[in-house]
Amino acid sequence: AMVTKNNGDLDKSGTECRLYCKDNSPGQNNSCKMFYSNEDEHKGMVLPGTK
């Protein structure tokens, strides 16, 4: 079962869940997903609002 992750959720080790986007350009239909910051899947993705 997929667990729905929410911004600010903490995993067992206390790592915060954040929204990562593939493209940070304004107006893009960004493909955004929630990841814990210690997960590898968000490599190459960016946090919204960061350059």
From Swiss-Prot:
Which GO CC annotations does the UniProt entry carry?
extracellular region
Q: Which ranges carry the Peptidase M12B domain?
A: 1-12
Q: In which tissues is it expressed?
A: Expressed by the venom gland.
Q: What is its EC number?
A: 3.4.24.-
Q: EC class of this enzyme?
A: hydrolase
> Subcellular localization, per the record?
Secreted
Q: Which residues are glycosylated according to the annotation?
A: N29
- Tell me the keywords, alphabetical order: Apoptosis, Glycoprotein, Hemostasis impairing toxin, Hydrolase, Metal-binding, Metalloprotease, Platelet aggregation inhibiting toxin, Protease, Secreted, Toxin, Zinc
Disintegrin domain boundaries = 13-18
* Quaternary context: Monomer.
- Name of the protein described by the UniProt record: Zinc metalloproteinase-disintegrin-like crovidisin
What's the source species for this entry?
Crotalus viridis viridis (Prairie rattlesnake)
Its ancestry begins with:
Eukaryota, Metazoa, Chordata, Craniata, Vertebrata
